[in-house]
Curated annotation (Swiss-Prot):
Monomer. GO terms for molecular function: ribosome binding; translation initiation factor activity. It is found in: Cytoplasm. Residues 1-21 are annotated as: Disordered. Keywords: Cytoplasm, Initiation factor, Protein biosynthesis. IF-3 binds to the 30S ribosomal subunit and shifts the equilibrium between 70S ribosomes and their 50S and 30S subunits in favor of the free subunits, thus enhancing the availability of 30S subunits on which protein synthesis initiation begins. It comes from Borrelia turicatae (strain 91E135). GO terms for biological process: ribosome disassembly. Belongs to the IF-3 family. The gene is infC. One of its GO terms (cellular component) is cytosol. This is Translation initiation factor IF-3. Signal peptide: none annotated.
């Protein structure tokens, strides 16, 4: 079938998206045509369009950057449907990892630390990275060893079995932080 546009000219150079050129929108004089049976031949554009029209299909430019451009004789509507279906499938399988932050102070109580630890474990089980931040104020900066102790106790409780330390404890200005990430499931 020959694709007839409904008045909307979707020229790839203008729209910016990856819309493929079909039939008379292909600008090359010669194209490499791949037929249904897999054979290839280099043809003038008029002959290639005529072959596509005879087969009641479309001439679709697959690789415009090669010399000569590569075209296939296929049903464009069906091809576009399969491409969109494949993109949706890839998008569905894509895992988005967020960075969650848990803040605390160096003079945190044990019950509060337990509560923060449960939050950290929950975030890691959801598959998110966790940035554990300790903010120092005033004279607390003289006691950074307390912050390192808190971060070490969190790491011991989290354990190495399911999680990996992505960024070790660092001090930036008045804050100390580390980043824990879940191990990738491959």
């Amino acid at each position: 079938m020959i694709n007839r546009s409904s008045g909307k000219d979707r020229d790839r150079s203008r729209s910016g998206d990856k819309e493929l050129r079909i039939n008379h929108k292909i600008k090359a004089r010669e194209v490499r045509v791949i037929f249904d049976n897999g054979t290839q031949s280099v043809l003038p554009i008029e002959d290639a369009i005529k072959c596509a029209r005879d087969a009641e299909l479309d001439l679709v430019e697959i690789s415009p950057n090669s010399v000569p451009p590569v075209c296939k004789i296929i049903d464009y509507g069906k091809y576009k449907f399969h491409q969109e279906k494949r993109q949706k499938e890839q998008k569905r399988n894509q895992k988005i990892i967020k960075l969650k932050e848990v803040r605390m102070q160096p003079k945190i109580d044990t019950h509060d630390l337990d509560f923060k630890y449960r939050n950290i474990l929950g975030f890691l089980k959801e598959g998110n990275k966790v940035k554990v931040t300790i903010r120092f104020r005033g004279r607390e900066l003289a006691h950074t060893h307390l912050g390192y102790g808190i971060l070490e106790s969190i790491l011991e409780r989290v354990g190495e079995s399911n999680y990996v330390l992505e960024s070790p404890a660092k001090m930036e200005g008045k804050t100390m932080f580390l980043i824990i990430a879940p191990k990738s499931k491959k």
